[in-house]
């Protein structure tokens, strides 16, 4: 079915203007599933489903062998959460016991790429790591569920935005590129007054300290001029994720040369092109 309907074009135009709506692609082999949470990384057919999620910091892992061990341990840890974490109702508990849904995610992916001299795109090295991630997360979770007499999980992997925890971990968030080398951050004081501070991105500073030239560090600001690279990379990583990926495609402001009424058809065709390989897509001008 041709997705290029007038309704689709209208929604694309609105997303380019305001960032709303986001898109959920539930067709083909994704027929009937729904993005189940606000960050959109969990998909399910069940209305009362829950998912035990956690993230591995790729940027701090040096070798594929270490990565395999950490993915194995992290998957077993999430399985333990299926019997320890409390849920608000019996209906939800019944669905959790039935589905045993897990969402082992990744953060620090862009830092991992930059440390190895890669651009924000799929490459053979990353493919090797993603194959380990896919295979070992399922193997470890299945083995541990069998050991604990739990149902094997309906899903294993989901990449959440990891906004706050990636700041605490000192790395890039989820799949996202570094927002900018330097930026102005605002924060609320006493719940009433906004204050501002200028900051060099901590991940960027760490990379610069390690000898990487600032001009070689791509950021979300740089990639905003080439959104297809962002969407293509999300599609390429999605091949290894059985839930979904939470990622926001940064765009120039509406009314500028790269985001305006004349670009709506181009963006609509671009989204339509990659939609079969995506579960969700969010843009923010």
Where are these regions (language model features)?
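Acidic/polar loop patches that form or flank catalytic/metal-binding clefts of enzymes
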Residues: 22-24, 121-122, 283
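Function-dense linear segments that define catalytic or interfacial modules
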Residues: 12-116, 182-191, 278
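Catalytic alpha/beta core of large soluble enzyme barrels
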Residues: 35-47, 54, 78-86, 159-161, ...
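Internal maturation/activation junctions in enzymes
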Residues: 75-93, 97, 108, 113-165, ...
């Amino acid at each position: 079915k041709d997705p290029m309907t007038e309704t689709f074009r209208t929604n694309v135009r609105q997303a380019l203007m305001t960032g709303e709506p986001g898109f959920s692609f539930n067709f083909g082999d994704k027929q009937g599933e729904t993005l189940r949470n606000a960050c959109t990384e969990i998909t399910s057919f069940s209305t009362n489903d829950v998912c035990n999620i956690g993230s591995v910091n790729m940027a701090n892992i040096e070798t594929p062998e270490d990565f395999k061990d950490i993915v194995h341990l992290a998957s077993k840890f999430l399985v333990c959460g299926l019997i320890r974490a409390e849920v608000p109702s019996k209906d939800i508990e019944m669905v959790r016991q039935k589905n045993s849904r897990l969402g082992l995610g990744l953060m620090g992916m862009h830092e991992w790429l930059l440390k190895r001299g890669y651009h924000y795109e799929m490459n053979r090295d990353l493919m090797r790591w993603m194959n380990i991630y896919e295979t070992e997360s399922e193997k470890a979770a299945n083995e541990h569920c069998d050991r604990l007499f739990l149902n094997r999980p309906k899903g294993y992997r989901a990449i959440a935005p990891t906004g706050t925890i990636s700041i605490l971990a000192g790395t890039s968030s989820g799949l996202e590129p570094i927002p900018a080398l330097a930026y102005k951050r605002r924060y609320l004081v006493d719940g009433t007054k906004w204050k501002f501070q200028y900051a060099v991105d901590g991940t960027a500073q760490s990379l610069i300290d390690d000898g990487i030239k600032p001009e070689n560090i791509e950021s979300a600001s740089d990639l905003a001029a080439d959104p297809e690279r962002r969407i293509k990379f999300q599609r390429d990583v999605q091949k290894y994720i059985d839930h979904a990926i939470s990622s926001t495609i940064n765009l120039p402001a509406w009314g500028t040369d790269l985001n305006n009424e004349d670009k709506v058809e181009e963006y609509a065709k671009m989204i339509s092109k990659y939609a079969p390989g995506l579960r969700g897509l969010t843009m923010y001008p």
